[in-house]
Amino acid sequence: MNPSPRKRVALFTDGACLGNPGPGGWAALLRFNAHEKLLSGGEACTTNNRMELKAAIEGLKALKEPCEVDLYTDSHYLKKAFTEGWLEGWRKRGWRTAEGKPVKNRDLWEALLLAMAPHRVRFHFVKGHTGHPENERVDREARRQAQSQAKTPCPPQAPTLFHEEA
């Protein structure tokens, strides 16, 4: 007996940050046929890349069953990690970059891999701020979330004399 085919879902994601680091927000819009669900959140002190990853993670985690997911993002960082082999290379090198430095946002990359595991995900790049309706919608929501976090400024970064540990 053949298993039933997976449902095909569109996931539109965006992250925003007021300063980098600074207050940030993320948004994810899920669409299945005529049904939509908008998810969003924010953090007081984060980066734009962390918010891009968080949007994808939370969108995928909201799915109740394994799906075929078309993930639309305006983040080269997110898309190229999968489509250009960055993530595969980082993992082979023990979460190190080609230069031997620890991969930034490893915690979120690992969370994203877990969130993706039950699904078949295809990444699509959408150029930001070009009038793409869903991208504009998640961009507005991510910025709204970032602004709602702006009450708490990031603590100043203290200079350090030591190398980062893995």
Curated annotation (Swiss-Prot):
Cofactor binding, per record: Binds 1 Mg(2+) ion per subunit. May bind a second metal ion at a regulatory site, or after substrate binding.
Domain of life: Bacteria
Annotated GO MF terms: magnesium ion binding; nucleic acid binding; RNA-DNA hybrid ribonuclease activity
Annotated segments matching region Disordered: 128-166
NCBIfam families: PRK00203.1
Record HAMAP family: RNase_H
Protein name in UniProt: Ribonuclease H
Species in which this protein is naturally found: Thermus thermophilus (strain ATCC BAA-163 / DSM 7039 / HB27)
